[in-house]
Swiss-Prot record:
Interacts with FtsZ. Residues 162-169 are annotated as: Lon protease binding. Induction: By DNA damage, as part of the SOS response. NCBIfam families: PRK10595.1, SOS_SulA_coli. GO terms for biological process: division septum assembly; DNA repair; negative regulation of cell division; SOS response. The record marks H169 as: Essential for degradation by Lon protease. The keyword Cell cycle applies. This is Cell division inhibitor SulA. Component of the SOS system and an inhibitor of cell division. Accumulation of SulA causes rapid cessation of cell division and the appearance of long, non-septate filaments. In the presence of GTP, binds a polymerization-competent form of FtsZ in a 1:1 ratio, thus inhibiting FtsZ polymerization and therefore preventing it from participating in the assembly of the Z ring. This mechanism prevents the premature segregation of damaged DNA to daughter cells during cell division. Belongs to the SulA family. The keyword Cell division applies.
Length: 169
């Protein structure tokens, strides 16, 4: 998972998911953009990492926006995941350029505690900077979900922290 600026904010690393969620929410005052890189054949790993944080952010009065490529979130899954059904919004079937643009606009508004978007390609430095600036303005958290094939390796890494889900087997 890639975090912009978040990794350098605290000298101690929270040891529990609850503490991590609380720390992320407290630090969201400056905005946060993270990239979650996961194997296409192991999407559950990304869910295990994100659901505690999403549940915690769901306690805010703001919406959670999911920008999904094709999949539609089911009411049953949202409820079973412990997410607030009344605060989850979804827009599906967006092309990648529209997903990035929509993420930037949504993050900037401040209406969303978290904006989650799926992108297949790595971001340019300019695109990443635009997302970070928008998250800071809107006091929001943005997650870029990027599935990769098992044999694909990242070409480069932004300065920050990137945790690949295959490290958690």
């Amino acid at each position: 998972m890639y975090t912009s600026g978040y990794a350098n904010r605290s000298s101690s690393f929270p040891t529990t998911t609850h503490n991590a969620a609380r720390a992320a929410t407290e630090n969201a005052a400056a905005g946060l953009v993270s990239e979650v890189v996961y194997h296409e054949d192991q999407p559950m790993m990304a869910q295990l990492l994100l659901l505690p944080l999403l549940r915690h952010l769901g306690q805010q009065s703001r919406w959670q926006l999911w920008l999904t490529p094709q999949q539609k979130l089911s009411r049953e899954w949202v409820q079973s995941a412990g997410l607030p059904l009344t605060k989850v919004m979804q827009i599906s079937q967006l092309a990648p350029p529209h997903t990035l643009e929509s993420m930037i606009r949504a993050l900037r508004t401040g209406n969303y505690s978290v904006v989650i978007g799926w992108l297949t390609e790595e971001l340019t430095e300019e695109e990443h900077a635009s997302l970070v600036e928008a998250a800071n303005v809107g006091n929001a958290v943005g997650f870029i979900m990027r599935p990769v094939r098992a044999h694909a390796l990242p070409r480069r890494q932004h300065s920050g922290l990137k945790i690949h889900s295959n490290l958690y087997h």
